[in-house]
Structure formats: C-alpha cells, structure tokens
Amino acid sequence: MPAPELTFQLLDGTAAAGHAEELQALHAEVYEAPPYRRAGDAAQFAGRFRVHRRQPGFVLAEARHGGYLVGYALGMPLRPATSWWADLTTPLPDDVTAERPGRTFAVADLLVRAPWRRQGIGRALHDLILSDRPEERATLTVVPAATAAQAAFRSWGWRKVARTRNQDPGSPASDVLVRALPATRGS
C-alpha cells in the first residue's frame, strides 16, 4: 500500500474547533522546545485559540500526513481596536500602527513538527493561509533566537518593523514582521 501523501486544507473557526486538542498538543510540542522554551503555554494556547477562532475572518491552514497533523498556521484580520501594536519596545508612527477594516491580517501561529521541517511544509502553510487574502498586508511575531524561522520569513518577503514585549510570563520578546499581500504588492 502506498504511503499517505501530505494534504493541506483551510478551515474556518467552527471547523477548527473540532481540532483544538490536536492543535494544542502540537503547539505544546513545538513551543516547549528550544529556542522558545515556553513550558506550560498549552493552557494559555487553549484560551487564545477559543478567542481567535471566533474572530471574523479567522482561518486555519493545516498539513496532514494521512490523518496525522504535522503542521498548521492560523490567523485573523486585525480589528481597529487591536492591541497588536501596544507593547512595542519603541513606538512606531501612527501610519504603521493604525488599523482599519481590511488593512492587516495577523498570522498568530505557524509551526511544523520537528521531523517534518525543511520539507517545504511551513512555506506551503504560509502560502495557503495568505492566499487570496483581501487585506493590504500581513503581520506576525517571531522570537529573535528562532534563526531558522527568521531566515525563512525574510526569504518569503517579510521585514522587521519593531520588537514587542511579550505579556506571557516567561516568554521572550518577539520581532514584529510585516509584508505586503499579493493583491497590493506593487500598487
């Protein structure tokens, strides 16, 4: 029998809710390891996920090998009253941080199980979650010590605009990255 192939799919918040335990387990597996070392973050993830999946425009991109979850990305559009830009170590101009409907899509998580990395799965999830987005730009945060992720994001067109203090206890500061989305690139 042939080995199962990788499959990718997009889920809305309602469909994603049925995968909450799997997502939480994978989140814990990835973020408890270096360079993140965010032990105990699983409970915080569960609370954040409940909030995120209910946001208008929420989307989850998942990668599976057979039925086995090997990676996912999730995000949602930022609202005008977002706190995304609130904890920057250096303030940015209002023209960067002011949000309006349709301006910014936030990639809240993008992760792949360690044995499945360096196979293009992260890039495929990245491209899937951002494909056909109507927003002008996207943003995400990444820990400076996550050098492989930093290099990947740079090669995918992201640029650092700031650093943010993480409000989660024991979590390191993160770089805030931004990139134009394809519909607006070059306009």
Predicted regions and their residues:
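Conserved acyl-donor/pantetheine-binding loop and adjacent beta-alpha core of acyl/acetyltransferases
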Residues: 74-111, 168-170
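Helix-loop element at the rim of GNAT/NAT acetyltransferase active sites that forms part
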Residues: 24-40
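Conserved acetyl-CoA-binding loop-helix of GNAT-fold acetyltransferases
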Residues: 107-114, 118-131, 151-155
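Short hydrophobic/aromatic beta-strand element in the GNAT-like acyltransferase core
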Residues: 57-62, 72, 104, 109, ...
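Conserved N-terminal entry element of GNAT/NAT acetyltransferase domains
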Residues: 1-18, 29, 187
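Conserved active-site alpha-helix within GNAT-family acetyltransferase domains
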Residues: 123-124, 137, 144-172
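Active-site rim helix/loop that mediates acceptor-substrate recognition in acyltransferases
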Residues: 37-60, 64-66, 70, 74-80, ...
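Conserved GNAT acetyl-CoA-binding A-motif
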Residues: 105, 131-145
